[in-house]
Amino acid sequence: MRHRLCAESDVPESGSIVLPFFGREVHVYRSGGRIRVAANVCVHFGGPLECKDGSFVCPWHGASYDMDSGRATGGPARKDAQLMFLSSRVENGDVNYVWGE
């Protein structure tokens, strides 16, 4: 199953775009030469995330996460905490969520 998220050209060169995803939200962004999709949820307390200076930061308590690995880098999140990435592919100029891959 594939679900179109956005056009590849909609994804900024820096920062992210936040999009609806089946009643929730995802960040779509560029990292390490590819497009990534991460759930817009802080694993510390479930708050939203903001993209700041190459990191995702929770405005509720200040937990921060590396955009490349998804690992917690600061704040109250457990040091072994990691963001949830979604499987995605760029096909024919579209960024698609790909279920089951």
Q: Where are the language model's segments positioned?
A:
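N-terminal pre-ligand scaffold of iron-sulfur
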Residues: 1-55, 66-67, 80-101
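Short cysteine/histidine-rich metal-coordination sites, predominantly Zn2+-binding motifs
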Residues: 56-62, 72-81
